[in-house]
């Protein structure tokens, strides 16, 4: 049939890309082949705009076992164990059907982890919504949170960390980024590489339906006109639990050569990717694929994104053992093809060839684009705004401002979110959500443990995408350092608008360059990740949102500390005393502005502050640690008091004098700042430690009592602050 523009739009190929495919193939592709090319050449699968840029990121390091290019990254922990980590987006499906979109996002990221041979032990999520007082945003919020909790809870995997942010720019395009970590024996890791011609290709899991067809291309274009409910998959966490356990068991047979999740572009992507990595070809017969719907065409079978499916390459000598294990788990597993040595992805239907493409054409020949990059003038104007031109906060207004910030959705307690998640199942959670700047998990049978967190301040990234992304890396690392963990590796999820627009491509370029610089200076490799572009509707884009997921290692999990103050003791500030109002939560709440330059970031000072905090925790000097981020110093102090359920008396005169303004000193934001509570009698040790690391330090006050007192500015019962903080999100939703 002739290829007309309507068909090209359906598969998200431009006329130029179609001409490229014809030239490379030496003939016109048929409709099935065209759909396969469109899916694998989509932004979602082919990374057309980001692939050249991602090469700038540091991906190697002394602990890295597996970097980008596999289902997930892996980092050495010690004693023969590795931690496997990955983050991915499910933004577009969640905007259409929030519950199932978020739920299947969790399912997909979990499959990426056990596809490596690792047992998933924890989840984290990074979420973005519009203003929560709006009914549609409440619908999205409750749907997404409910979907994450439902799928994770049913799977028996705790959701222990994450972050959430609310801003008008996310009204039409919410973001749902899901992260999973797993633990494996290094020797048991398996790669998704289809080696060994003659080995068998096995499809296991759910029967294939029509759900999710064109899901990859849907996530690669801006198309607000169409209803896309049909491309949102429906998840079955109970089936995934069986799949997880069965896949880990069949790996023990030694007969499994490769394993791959069926995610975006379904069977097409999974088979092409494992063949490409293995330097082989694959022949499949779609007539052998179990289906739950009648009349499905080869096109639909190859592009279906039905959930809870895995593709395995199995040695023929072990196939009976593998299939027997799957039967015992009551899973439908069938041999649908074999590995070949001709480098082709050949699709049969009842033995007749219906599509045949070179694997390299699908995976390596996807065009890449370098676009014009130009910063939007409106953003330059916003960044040039000087917050000092605004009237300063008056002393009598400080307590009221503190209350307003504590109940604002971007600062209020996240308990209404994480209470819907089972965060203690598996009995590994040492520091749960809300107790610390990062979650801490033990590894059974080991003294060491891991910490994990996600971070990104989109206001900073909007105003300065390079600096804002550097802040995201620094804050994520600071968060795991504040529990005593050494940052090991990062997995990133780059959420942006339409890269064909110069101002959006500029944001993407700047963000990746900023991430590369921060990771290089801090010595943290990027081992996996995901790119989600075209997050915009009718030309209105989301702010650049490069989410950083991080994993850290604690040498002794028993020595971790939380953010809550523990009993009476002195409190100190480590890091710079200077702050800024640019891009701050205060500026948005008080003046309704997202403007000014984000705080400067000295990466060398950041590195020293984090090392100082980690050593202080390891030596037992530091009893509690909390980084100063959104809301500034006063919010950080209040949060540590509220979490620890103890009051305190603090003084800020020197900070006010140094900053020259009351609002900047109390609610201004800055990088490289951590408040710490010190063990009785250990004040001198902290001062000596700070000097040794070259870190500024000053005393802020002392904990005790049941009131929160800041000089002559604030004197309130802690219980009142707790009430404001813990109900803020509930009242908004």
UniProtKB/Swiss-Prot annotation:
GO terms for cellular component: cytoplasm. It comes from Thermomicrobium roseum (strain ATCC 27502 / DSM 5159 / P-2). Keywords: ATP-binding, Cytoplasm, Ligase, Magnesium, Metal-binding, Nucleotide-binding, Purine biosynthesis. It catalyses: N(2)-formyl-N(1)-(5-phospho-beta-D-ribosyl)glycinamide + L-glutamine + ATP + H2O = 2-formamido-N(1)-(5-O-phospho-beta-D-ribosyl)acetamidine + L-glutamate + ADP + phosphate + H(+). Pfam families: AIRS, AIRS_C, FGAR-AT_linker. It comes from the Bacteria. Part of the phosphoribosylformylglycinamidine synthase complex involved in the purines biosynthetic pathway. Catalyzes the ATP-dependent conversion of formylglycinamide ribonucleotide (FGAR) and glutamine to yield formylglycinamidine ribonucleotide (FGAM) and glutamate. The FGAM synthase complex is composed of three subunits. PurQ produces an ammonia molecule by converting glutamine to glutamate. PurL transfers the ammonia molecule to FGAR to form FGAM in an ATP-dependent manner. Monomer. Part of the FGAM synthase complex composed of 1 PurL, 1 PurQ and 2 PurS subunits. InterPro entries: PRibForGlyAmidine_synth_PurL, PurL_linker, PurM-like_C_dom, PurM-like_C_sf, PurM-like_N, PurM-like_N_sf. GO terms for biological process: 'de novo' IMP biosynthetic process. ATP binds at residues 47, 86, 492, 529. The active site is at 44, 90 (proton acceptor). It is found in: Cytoplasm. SUPFAM superfamilies: PurM C-terminal domain-like (SSF56042), PurM N-terminal domain-like (SSF55326). Mg(2+) 1 binds at residues 88, 530. Belongs to the FGAMS family. Pathway: Purine metabolism; IMP biosynthesis via de novo pathway; 5-amino-1-(5-phospho-D-ribosyl)imidazole from N(2)-formyl-N(1)-(5-phospho-D-ribosyl)glycinamide: step 1/2. Gene3D superfamilies: PurM-like C-terminal domain, PurM-like, N-terminal domain. Its EC number is 6.3.5.3. It is an enzyme of class 6 (ligase). This is Phosphoribosylformylglycinamidine synthase subunit PurL. Substrate binds at residues 89-92, 111, 233, 305-307, 532. One of its GO terms (molecular function) is phosphoribosylformylglycinamidine synthase activity. Mg(2+) 2 binds at residues 112, 261. Its main location: cytoplasm.
């Amino acid at each position: 049939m002739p290829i007309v523009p309507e068909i090209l739009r359906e598969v998200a190929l431009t006329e130029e890309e179609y001409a490229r495919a014809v030239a490379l193939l030496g003939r016109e592709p048929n409709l099935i082949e065209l759909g396969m090319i469109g899916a694998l050449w989509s932004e979602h699968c082919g990374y057309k705009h980001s692939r050249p840029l991602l090469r700038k990121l540091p991906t190697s390091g002394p602990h890295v076992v597996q970097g980008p290019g596999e289902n997930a990254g892996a980092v050495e922990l010690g004693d023969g164990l590795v931690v496997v980590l990955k983050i991915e987006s499910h933004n577009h499906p969640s905007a259409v059907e929030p519950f199932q979109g978020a739920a299947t996002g969790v399912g997909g990221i979990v499959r990426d982890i056990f596809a490596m041979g690792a047992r998933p032990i924890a989840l984290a999520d990074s979420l973005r919504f519009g203003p929560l007082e709006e009914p549609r945003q409440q619908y999205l919020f409750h749907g997404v949170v409910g979907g994450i909790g439902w799928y994770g809870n049913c799977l028996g995997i705790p959701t222990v960390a994450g972050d959430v942010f609310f801003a008008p720019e996310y009204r039409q395009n919410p973001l749902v980024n899901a992260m999973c970590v797993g633990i494996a024996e290094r020797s048991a890791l398996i790669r998704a590489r289809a080696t060994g011609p003659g080995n068998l290709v096995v499809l296991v899991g759910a029967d294939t339906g029509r759900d999710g067809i064109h899901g990859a291309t849907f996530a690669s274009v801006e198309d607000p006109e169409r209803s896309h409910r049909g491309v949102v998959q429906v998840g079955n966490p109970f089936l995934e639990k069986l799949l997880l356990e069965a896949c880990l068991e069949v790996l023990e047979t030694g007969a499994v050569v490769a394993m791959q999740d069926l995610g975006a572009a379904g069977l097409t992507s999974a088979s092409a990717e494992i063949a490409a990595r293995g330097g082989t070809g694959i022949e499949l017969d779609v007539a052998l694929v179990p289906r739950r719907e009648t009349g499905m065409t080869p096109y639909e079978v190859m592009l279906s994104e039905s959930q809870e499916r895995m593709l395995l390459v199995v040695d023929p000598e072990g196939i009976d053992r593998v299939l027997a294990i799957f039967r015992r788990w009551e899973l439908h597993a069938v041999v649908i093809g074999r590995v070949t040595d001709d480098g082709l992805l050949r699709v049969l239907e009842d033995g007749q060839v219906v599509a045949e493409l070179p694997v390299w054409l699908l995976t390596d020949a996807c065009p890449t684009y370098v676009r014009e990059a130009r910063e939007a003038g409106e953003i330059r104007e916003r960044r040039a705004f000087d917050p000092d031109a605004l009237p300063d906060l008056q002393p009598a207004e400080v307590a009221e401002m503190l209350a307003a910030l504590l109940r604002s959705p971007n600062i209020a307690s996240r308990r209404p979110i994480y209470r819907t998640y089972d965060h203690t199942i598996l009995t590994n959670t040492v520091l749960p959500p809300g107790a610390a700047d990062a979650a801490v998990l033990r590894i059974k049978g080991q003294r060491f443990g891991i910490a994990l967190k996600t971070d990104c301040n989109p206001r900073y990234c909007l105003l300065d995408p390079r600096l804002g992304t550097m802040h995201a890396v620094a804050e994520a690392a600071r968060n795991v350092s504040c529990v005593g963990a050494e940052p090991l590796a990062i997995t990133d999820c780059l959420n942006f608008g339409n890269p064909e627009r110069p101002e959006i491509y500029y944001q993407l370029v700047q963000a990746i360059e900023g991430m590369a610089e921060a990771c290089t200076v801090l010595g943290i490799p990027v081992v996996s990740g995901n790119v989600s572009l075209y997050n915009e509707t009718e030309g209105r884009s989301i702010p650049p949102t490069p989410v950083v997921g991080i994993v850290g290692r604690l040498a002794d999990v028993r020595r971790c500390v939380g953010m809550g103050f523990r009993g009476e003791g002195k409190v100190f500030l480590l890091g710079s005393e200077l702050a800024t109002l640019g891009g701050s939560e205060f500026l948005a709440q008080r003046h309704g502005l997202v403007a000014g330059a984000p705080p400067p970031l000295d990466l060398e000072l950041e590195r020293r502050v984090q090392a100082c905090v980690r050593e202080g925790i390891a030596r037992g000097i530091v009893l509690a640690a909390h980084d100063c981020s959104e809301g500034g110093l006063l919010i950080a102090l209040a949060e540590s008091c509220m979490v620890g359920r103890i009051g305190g008396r603090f003084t800020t005169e020197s900070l006010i004098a140094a900053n020259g303004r009351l609002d900047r000193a109390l609610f201004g934001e800055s990088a490289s700042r951590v408040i710490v509570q010190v063990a009785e009698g250990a004040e001198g040790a902290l001062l000596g430690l700070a000097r040794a690391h070259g870190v500024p330090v000053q005393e802020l006050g002392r904990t005790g009592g049941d009131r929160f007192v800041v000089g002559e500015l604030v004197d309130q019962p802690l219980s009142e602050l707790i009430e404001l903080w813990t109900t803020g999100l509930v009242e908004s939703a």
